[in-house]
Amino acid sequence: MAERVYPADSPPQSGQFSGNFSSGEFPKKPAPPPSTYVIQVPKDQIYRIPPPENAHRFEQLSRKKTNRSNCRCCFCSFLAAVFILIVLAGISFAVLYLIYRPEAPKYSIEGFSVSGINLNSTSPISPSFNVTVRSRNGNGKIGVYYEKESSVDVYYNDVDISNGVMPVFYQPAKNVTVVKLVLSGSKIQLTSGMRKEMRNEVSKKTVPFKLKIKAPVKIKFGSVKTWTMIVNVDCDVTVDKLTAPSRIVSRKCSHDVDLW
């Protein structure tokens, strides 16, 4: 019979252990190469973040960041609340406008007499005007409160020569109110050119003046009263003479409202 030939033992491959495990021997750790240093650090220093010398500083910075974050949150909440209030106010105003359809009162000049203007002297004048203003509130469900701190001025050639105020009163819906005003000026110095121009206008019986009214008002919608608004009335009035009684030759008024 032929003899069996067994393969020879192959040397151990790279990465395989060649130690005798049966005898309990394990391969030793390789020694570090020359010029290599191994530093061992205690575990309590490795996991300590931040290090002890910076711990207090770290706590201060963390506290500041928390405070800043809280301030930002409060400020953002405040802005959001203000924005919501503005939106709600705008919606309420729009609803009231659609329900009531408000219109500004109509104004006209019913009487306008002048006294105290002497064109034959160069001395300062102290003019006086008796003015009758008619206000018509045509709104069906809206009242108007005329507040304090109003102003009424009479101008000639852009020179303020007399002034006064509107009375404080309440004008209900669908109402016509006639207001009598007494306006006066003191020591108004007219130039020679203004006196000459006035004399020429008196001869033609067309002396022009401008009346300006600024009246703070509040509007009443049912039981709701609005904030203060400003009614501005501008009237061009022409009279025939500078003594009472004078006759109105022409008149024209316009108005607008400052909501804020």
Curated annotation (Swiss-Prot):
Upregulating conditions: Induced by infection with avirulent Pseudomonas syringae pv. tomato DC3000 (Pst DC3000) carrying the avirulence gene avrRpt2. Down-regulated by Pst DC3000 virulence factors AvrE and HopM1.
UniProt-annotated glycosylation sites, renumbered to this chain: N120, N130, N175
Compartments (UniProt record): Cell membrane
Any Gene Ontology biological process: defense response to bacterium
Protein's membrane topology: Single-pass membrane protein
Keyword Cell membrane among UniProt keywords: yes
Keywords tagged on the record: Cell membrane, Glycoprotein, Membrane, Plant defense, Transmembrane, Transmembrane helix
GO cellular component annotations of the record: plasma membrane; plasmodesma
Feature: compositional bias, Low complexity: 13-24
Pfam families with a match to the protein in the record: LEA_2
Region entry Disordered, spans: 1-35
Superkingdom of origin: Eukaryota
Membrane-traversing stretches: 79-99
Phenotype reported upon loss of the gene: No visible phenotype under normal growth conditions, but mutant plant display enhanced susceptibility to the bacterial pathogen Pseudomonas syringae pv. tomato DC3000 (Pst DC3000).
InterPro entries: LEA_2, NDR1-like
Function description: Required for plant immunity against the bacterial pathogen Pseudomonas syringae pv. tomato DC3000 (Pst DC3000).
Protein's UniProt name: NDR1/HIN1-like protein 13
Species of the source: Arabidopsis thaliana
Gene: NHL13
